[in-house]
UniProtKB/Swiss-Prot annotation:
This is Protein Tat. Transmembrane segments: none annotated. GO terms for molecular function: actinin binding; cyclin binding; metal ion binding; protein domain specific binding; protein serine/threonine phosphatase inhibitor activity; RNA-binding transcription regulator activity; trans-activation response element binding. Residues 48-101 are annotated as: Disordered. Keywords: Acetylation, Activator, AIDS, Apoptosis, Host cytoplasm, Host nucleus, Host-virus interaction, Inhibition of host innate immune response by virus, Inhibition of host interferon signaling pathway by virus, Interferon antiviral system evasion, Isopeptide bond, Metal-binding, Methylation, Modulation of host chromatin by virus, Modulation of host PP1 activity by virus, Phosphoprotein, RNA-binding, Secreted, Transcription, Transcription regulation, Ubl conjugation, Viral immunoevasion, Zinc. Transcriptional activator that increases RNA Pol II processivity, thereby increasing the level of full-length viral transcripts. Recognizes a hairpin structure at the 5'-LTR of the nascent viral mRNAs referred to as the transactivation responsive RNA element (TAR) and recruits the cyclin T1-CDK9 complex (P-TEFb complex) that will in turn hyperphosphorylate the RNA polymerase II to allow efficient elongation. The CDK9 component of P-TEFb and other Tat-activated kinases hyperphosphorylate the C-terminus of RNA Pol II that becomes stabilized and much more processive. The cell attachment site mediates the interaction with ITGAV/ITGB3 and ITGA5/ITGB1 integrins, leading to vascular cell migration and invasion. This interaction also provides endothelial cells with the adhesion signal they require to grow in response to mitogens. The Cys-rich region may bind 2 zinc ions. This region is involved in binding to KAT5. It comes from Human immunodeficiency virus type 1 group M subtype B (isolate SF162). The modification Asymmetric dimethylarginine is found at residues 52-53. Belongs to the lentiviruses Tat family. A motif (Nuclear localization signal, RNA-binding (TAR), and protein transduction) lies at residues 49-57. Residues 1-48 are annotated as: Transactivation. The lineage of its organism: Viruses, Riboviria, Pararnavirae, Artverviricota, Revtraviricetes. Residues 22-37 are annotated as: Cysteine-rich.
């Protein structure tokens, strides 16, 4: 290895910079172009500020078209309040007395 001038900053050392500039391309060759390209393109790591996505707001006149739903009555227990056993017996009795079917 060649001796490096100690007065040079580390990012200006020979061989520290690639000969070609970085591009926006994401092909395999460009992803392995340099360490920065590998980290940002290959691994997808970026430490820049994240852009806040703006919510798509509805037009102001869209509120007119919304119809308020009527309040539903409180839930009532469905089925026979006497219990499942008695209701089964009741159904059996009705089927016995109904000769139509």
């Amino acid at each position: 290895m060649e001796p490096v001038d100690p007065r040079l900053e580390p990012w200006k050392h020979p061989g520290s910079q690639p000969k070609t500039a970085c591009t926006n391309c994401y092909c395999k060759k460009c992803c392995f172009h340099c360490q920065v390209c590998f980290i940002t393109k290959g691994l997808g790591i970026s430490y820049g500020r994240k852009k806040r996505r703006q919510r798509r707001r509805a037009p102001p006149d869209s509120e007119v078209h919304q119809v308020s739903l009527p309040k539903q009555p409180a839930s009532q227990p469905q089925g026979d309040p006497t219990g499942p056993k008695e209701s089964k017996k009741k159904v059996e009795r009705e089927t016995e007395t109904d000769p139509v079917h």
